[in-house]
Regions:
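Active-site phosphate/pyrophosphate- and oxyanion-stabilizing loops and adjacent acidic/basic residues
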Residues: 48, 123, 155
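Short, hinge-like loop/turn segments at secondary-structure boundaries
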Residues: 75-79, 127-128, 152
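Helix-adjacent hinge/juxtasegments
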Residues: 79-107
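Acidic, proline/glycine-rich short linear motifs
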Residues: 4, 8, 15-20, 62-89, ...
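General small-molecule cofactor/ligand-binding pocket signal
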Residues: 59-61, 109-113, 166-168
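Glycine-rich, Arg-bearing micro-motifs that act as flexible, cationic patches
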Residues: 133-159, 173-178
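Small/aliphatic-rich secondary-structure junction motif
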Residues: 20-74, 160, 181
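Structural beta-alpha unit
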Residues: 2-25, 99-134, 172-176, 181
Length: 181
């Protein structure tokens, strides 16, 4: 988790950059962190519907988190390659899902990062000034909405996150999502 500012702690939230989504040559991107959870499909459906209706695009982010193998160089490299291959497989899966939802012509940038997920999300938002909205899916699990929703939308970062976060309830069907997006 990111430390709170002040009292000698490191403040990881950089100054917010101006978004350029309406400038000539730019268009709004909806950021979706992709994984294999059911709620991710809800986020994808909402983001794709919004991007399609507003002439936007998708930025699909997969983060390969570091393992505990850093002292075993060969094992770390194998784990890294497996993570990248898994990311590519997830992108293929979500490409098929977008096509089945009728969004095959929607621009979807595929981004693979290595590191801690919350830090990589902030980095990609700061690097790409066209990313204007992050879309997360909330889990239907009674234990909570999921670790990413909890960390980003209800955690210490929420008041200073660089862009708005849209949270899609996990119990909405794709038709309901398309209707409200």
């Amino acid at each position: 988790m990111l430390p709170a500012p002040g009292n000698g702690s490191i403040h990881l939230m950089p100054d917010k950059k101006k978004r350029h989504v309406f400038d000539k040559g730019h268009r709004r991107k909806f950021l979706v962190v992709v994984d294999e959870t059911p709620e991710c499909e809800s986020a994808l459906a909402f983001a794709a519907s919004r991007a399609n209706r507003t002439n936007g695009a998708l930025a699909l982010l997969y983060v390969v988190e570091p393992g505990d193998f850093q002292h075993w160089l060969g094992v770390e490299e194998i784990a890294r390659e497996e993570g990248i291959n898994k990311a590519r497989a997830v992108f293929r899966l979500f490409g098929r899902k977008l096509k089945s939802m009728g969004f095959e012509k929607l621009d979807a940038e595929e981004i693979i990062r290595e590191g801690k997920i919350d830090e990589e999300i902030v980095k990609i938002i700061e690097e790409d000034e066209d990313i204007a909205i992050m879309v997360l899916g909330a889990s239907k699990d009674p234990s909570g909405p999921g670790p990413l929703v909890t960390a980003l939308a209800a955690g210490k970062m929420v008041g200073e996150f660089p862009i708005p976060i849209t949270i899609v309830p996990g119990d909405l069907g794709q038709d309901e999502i398309k209707d409200i997006a």
